[in-house]
């Protein structure tokens, strides 16, 4: 956080700063730490030694640019070179070379990595801190059982528990318990050392009986007992050195490694002075933990809160990348060792370059970015989504929790989250509370703790000094809440303010305050900080709003909000969607593709994004904002992004809204809109879909891209050029060919179709031996071709030489079934589009744009939308924009209401429209029915809120099946929109037909027109010949499937037919 010129004022840190700092820590520290761990490698005869000289490693600047990496589906990475030496011990000769050991993926200016042309981001994981924790639980008899849990660096657990008889047991990873004396003896301590290093030796002496004394009589017996309990599969083990080494490797090295953080926490908790370099669990640690457990049993000491943030740590991108780098070095070590041994065996002379290959780094990082749960594809629906994704916190992932097993207590808000983790912004569904978001001012400390800034209030100095505190420190201070007055207002000494102390909220005098919050937004994430009047909303609705803002699609013409919070500019700036001037200069040339300006004699060109596709199929582009010849300053906005206006975030539109019922069309969260929103492209958005096809080299030969496709209509090939690829600017319909491709196949007589064999036999025509495998446009993909890319990867394999990508743009107006939402959790589906003359209109004749249900406000308690609605109307009339920080009631009571009413009154006076503010019902107005011209009985709340169009579009979801594919085994229709699946007549349609009594239509729907195979064929024959359609004699496939499923449950089912002649019952198998 940067100090400003004004006293006590600071700028908000960059929203991508946590990602940048983590990656820089990996490059500056993590690489060197892991390289120093690389051992010297010797052959079996110890004649040759291989080592790395890591002090002078080099990272080379990438050979390609970010745009080229995305365009060509490559990884944006840097090559790592390290000097290596090969030493012959007999002659003491050394051969030194600088070797290339692998590529390190780099982070770009968005805080993301480009892997195979795809933007990916590594999110932060929150884990339990390694160390010692004490807790108490009630057993089945209602008696408290005290437990000490020692958590290792990788998450393994060793539990010590004391029972009613004051006996101490050890339990490894929740398995069967053993005596703590057996554990300590297996770790190398004898009984005398144990008794000399504990505070309560009498408890340890009263514990063992004769059998136990025999087990702890020697280290060998203790190791056998321990091995038999936790590692032995079966039988009676016999002590040996290999058994001892196996136990040492499986348990004492892997499960008992505390790490640097665990050693520090254990020393602090147990008052030990063990050196930080000793990161493994020692017998002294176990003895101290047992001593403290006995004191807990006697009522001395305090229990630990496992959910407190002081007992958590952040596993950032630096830790994850460092772990993968260490794993790659281990694989490299194994490969080098094997290569050296092979060279010596075959009497070859190796050199450092021949010993090292880069495959270990390539495979490690590709598998990490592609398969690791914490490496995710960057969500680029809009700039807010992009920034919020990088600040996400997850309890899930390796070493963490799962959505099925996490308890409610872990998911709940904790007092230590104050100012660190947003209490609002979390996912909905099974992962609620497990996926969180960082507050906007936090930083990650050296030990992985989440630190939050506070103003330190000093009696000696009137200046405010800002300090960052970890969760373990701020609970010892009296912290004034952020809704106290600002610094420059001056606070009376006798004033009483709300404060926080030791996880409790108090009301105390100002002179007792030690710290105070620095900003009203300090507790919230970016998404929650963009909600105006959030303090008037229920937290559940604020949660929905912060999630739905990330689902807003970029519109064709953006508009910034009238009522905002002030964070819109920084959000847009840090997202990187706008083009910013890096230095001052003068604009020489500008168009839609680039901006050229001169600065100090140098000419610089800034390329602009032009209709690029995001991974959510939304459209990203930049619009120049500076004319030719204009002088610009450093940091000035040169081009706006798809969802920015003047450098501010603009996700939606300010539209005129009335809260009133209208003929039931807006019941249950439905929304009624005017046709103006369609015809004037208010909510029109562009979608870009990507279609790709690859050419392979098959065993019969290479696949060919061509326009000459046999057995296809010319109509489907009309948009292809002479190379067989669709032309730019073409309008494509469903089923059209985008890329023509032929795949060679074996030319056997049996593989020909009957008509092909006939042509060969009669006319002697040689039938093609290639199979048509063209790229066709799928259902719902109609649009305009805006880009075609024919890509051949650099150094690519001959087995995958080429890839062709076609990008198709769709223009989507708002329509019935689309989802819209405000910024207060007020969401709805478009139910009807009315002509503008039928919409309710104001007293000046302006028809409203949307009609919301007023019942959506009281029960959901999101009153903030009412304040925004009325203030937006005043701002529209006064041509003003408002940026309001939350919790403005800290200045005076009813501050929000007073602001809104005063602005409405000013708008009423300035526009000379008394209906804008009527004292009898302020904020409401009499409006008229557009159909009749009569006024409505009650005054209606009208205003201009900011409404977003969400990515849940009806064009992506609506689906109906006419004919399609069937499953081969069951002969039932496939499921899913992508497979053209579904039922033509479902359960409810059958009920409707039954209600009308149409028996013959119902029979047709369930037999001929469905899955009755034989009857379908007979219908085809009867239609061609012209006869009557025979009645089906047996059951359709759906009934046969039911019978088979019943038989699988051991239920035999047969059906019987009654003969028409003699009514004899003839049994017939189903």
Swiss-Prot record:
It is an enzyme of class 2 (transferase). GO terms for cellular component: chloroplast; DNA-directed RNA polymerase complex; mitochondrion. One of its GO terms (molecular function) is DNA binding. One of its GO terms (biological process) is DNA-templated transcription. The keyword Transcription applies. It is found in: Plastid, Chloroplast. Keywords: Chloroplast, DNA-directed RNA polymerase, Nucleotidyltransferase, Plastid, Transcription, Transferase. It catalyses: RNA(n) + a ribonucleoside 5'-triphosphate = RNA(n+1) + diphosphate. Transmembrane segments: none annotated. The keyword tRNA-binding does not apply. It comes from the Eukaryota. Its main location: plastid. Its EC number is 2.7.7.6. Belongs to the RNA polymerase beta chain family. DNA-dependent RNA polymerase catalyzes the transcription of DNA into RNA using the four ribonucleoside triphosphates as substrates. This is DNA-directed RNA polymerase subunit beta. It comes from Dioscorea elephantipes. The lineage of its organism: Eukaryota, Viridiplantae, Streptophyta, Embryophyta, Tracheophyta.
């Amino acid at each position: 956080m940067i100090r400003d010129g004004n006293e006590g004022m600071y700028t908000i840190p960059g929203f991508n700063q946590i990602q940048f700092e983590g990656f820089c820590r990996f490059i500056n520290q993590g690489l060197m730490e892991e390289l120093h761990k690389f051992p010297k490698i010797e052959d079996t005869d110890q004649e040759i030694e291989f080592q790395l000289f890591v002090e002078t490693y080099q990272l080379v600047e990438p050979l390609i640019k970010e745009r080229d990496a995305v365009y060509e589906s490559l990884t944006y990475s840097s090559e790592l070179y390290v000097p290596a030496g090969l030493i012959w011990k007999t002659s003491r000769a050394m051969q030194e070379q600088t070797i290339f050991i692998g590529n390190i993926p780099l982070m770009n200016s968005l805080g993301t990595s480009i892997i195979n042309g795809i933007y990916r981001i590594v999110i932060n994981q929150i884990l339990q801190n390694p160390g010692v924790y004490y807790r108490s639980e009630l057993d089945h008899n209602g008696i408290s059982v005290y437990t000490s849990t020692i958590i290792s660096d990788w998450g393994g657990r060793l539990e010590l528990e004391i029972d009613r008889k004051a006996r101490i047991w050890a339990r490894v990873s929740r398995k069967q318990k053993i005596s703590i004396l057996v554990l300590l003896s297996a770790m190398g301590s004898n009984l005398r050392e144990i008794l000399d290093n504990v505070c309560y030796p009498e408890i340890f002496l009263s514990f063992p009986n004769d059998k136990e004394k025999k087990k702890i009589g020697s280290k060998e017996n203790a190791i056998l007992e321990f091995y038999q309990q936790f590692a032995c599969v079966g039988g009676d083990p016999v002590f040996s050195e290999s058994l001892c080494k196996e136990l040492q490797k499986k348990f004492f090295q892997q499960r008992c490694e505390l790490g640097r953080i665990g050693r520090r926490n254990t020393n602090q908790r147990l008052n030990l002075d063990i050196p930080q370099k000793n990161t493994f669990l020692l017998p002294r640690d176990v003895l101290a933990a047992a001593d403290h457990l006995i004191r807990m049993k006697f009522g001395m000491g305090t229990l630990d809160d496992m959910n407190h943030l002081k007992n958590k740590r952040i596993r950032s991108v630096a830790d994850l990348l460092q772990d993968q780098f260490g794993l790659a070095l281990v694989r490299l070590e194994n490969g080098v060792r094997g290569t050296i041994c092979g060279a010596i065996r075959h009497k070859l002379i190796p050199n450092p370059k021949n010993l090292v290959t880069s495959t270990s780094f390539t495979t490690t990082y590709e598998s990490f970015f592609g398969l690791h749960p914490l490496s995710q594809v960057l969500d680029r629906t809009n700039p807010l989504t992009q920034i919020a994704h990088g600040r996400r916190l997850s309890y899930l992932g390796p070493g963490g929790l799962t959505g099925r097993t996490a308890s409610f207590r872990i998911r709940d808000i904790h007092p230590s989250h104050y100012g660190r983790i947003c209490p609002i912004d979390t996912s909905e569904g099974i992962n609620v509370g497990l996926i969180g978001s960082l507050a906007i001012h936090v930083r990650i400390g050296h030990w992985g703790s989440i630190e939050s800034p506070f103003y330190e209030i000093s009696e000696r100095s009137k200046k405010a000094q800002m300090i960052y505190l970890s969760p373990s420190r701020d609970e010892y201070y009296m912290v004034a809440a952020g809704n106290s007055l600002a610094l420059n207002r001056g606070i009376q000494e006798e004033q009483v303010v709300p404060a926080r102390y030791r996880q409790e909220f108090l009301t105390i005098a100002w002179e007792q305050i030690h710290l105070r919050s620095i900003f009203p937004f300090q507790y919230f994430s970016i998404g929650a900080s963009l909600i105006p009047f959030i303090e008037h909303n229920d937290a559940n609705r604020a949660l929905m709003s912060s999630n739905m803002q990330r689902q807003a699609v970029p519109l064709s013409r953006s508009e910034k909000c009238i009522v905002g919070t002030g964070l819109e500019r920084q959000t847009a700036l840090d997202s990187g969607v706008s083009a910013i001037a890096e230095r001052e200069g003068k604009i020489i040339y500008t168009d839609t593709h680039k901006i050229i300006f001169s600065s100090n004699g140098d000419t610089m060109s800034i390329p602009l994004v032009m209709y690029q596709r995001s991974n959510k199929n939304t459209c990203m582009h930049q619009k120049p904002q500076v004319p030719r010849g204009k002088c610009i300053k450093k940091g000035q906005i040169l081009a706006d992004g798809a969802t920015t206006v003047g450098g501010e975030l603009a996700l939606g539109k300010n539209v005129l809204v009335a809260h009133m019922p209208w003929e039931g069309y807006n019941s249950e969260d439905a929304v009624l809109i005017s046709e103006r929103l369609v015809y004037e492209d208010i909510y029109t958005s562009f979608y870009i879909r990507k279609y790709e096809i690859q050419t392979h080299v098959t065993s019969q030969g290479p696949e060919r891209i061509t326009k000459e496709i046999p057995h296809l209509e010319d109509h489907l090939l009309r948009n292809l050029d002479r190379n067989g690829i669709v032309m730019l600017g073409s309008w494509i319909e469903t089923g059209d060919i985008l890329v023509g491709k032929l795949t060679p196949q074996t030319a056997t007589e049996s593989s020909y179709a009957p008509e092909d064999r006939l042509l060969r036999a009669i006319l002697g025509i040689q039938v093609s031996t290639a199979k048509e495998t063209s790229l066709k446009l799928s259902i719902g993909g109609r649009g305009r071709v805006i880009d075609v890319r024919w890509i051949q990867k650099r150094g690519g394999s001959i087995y995958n030489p080429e890839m062709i990508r076609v990008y198709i743009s769709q223009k989507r107006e708002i329509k019935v079934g689309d989802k819209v939402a405000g910024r207060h959790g007020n969401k709805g589906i478009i139910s009807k589009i009315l002509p503008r003359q039928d919409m309710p209109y104001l007293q000046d004749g302006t028809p409203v744009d949307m009609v919301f249900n007023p019942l959506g406000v009281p029960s959901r308690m999101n009153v903030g939308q009412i304040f925004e609605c009325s203030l937006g109307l005043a701002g529209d009339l006064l041509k003003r924009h408002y940026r309001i920080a939350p919790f403005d009631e800290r200045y005076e009571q009813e501050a929000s209401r007073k602001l809104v009413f005063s602005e409405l009154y000013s708008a009423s006076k300035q526009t000379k429209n008394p209906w804008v503010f009527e004292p009898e019902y302020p904020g409401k107005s009499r409006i008229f029915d557009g159909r009749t011209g009569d006024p409505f009985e009650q005054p209606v709340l009208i205003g201009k809120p900011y409404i977003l169009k969400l990515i849940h579009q009806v064009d992506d979801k609506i689906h109906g099946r006419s004919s399609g594919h069937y499953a081969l085994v069951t002969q039932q229709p496939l499921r899913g929109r992508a497979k053209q699946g579904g039922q033509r007549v479902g359960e409810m349609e059958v009920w409707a037909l039954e209600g009308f009594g149409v028996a013959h239509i119902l029979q047709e729907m369930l037999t001929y027109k469905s899955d009755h195979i034989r009857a379908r064929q007979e219908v085809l024959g009867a239609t061609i010949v012209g006869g009557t359609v025979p009645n089906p004699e047996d059951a359709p496939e759906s009934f046969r499937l039911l019978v088979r499923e019943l038989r699988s449950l051991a239920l035999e089912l047969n059906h019987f037919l009654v003969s028409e002649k003699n009514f004899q019952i003839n049994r017939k198998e189903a």
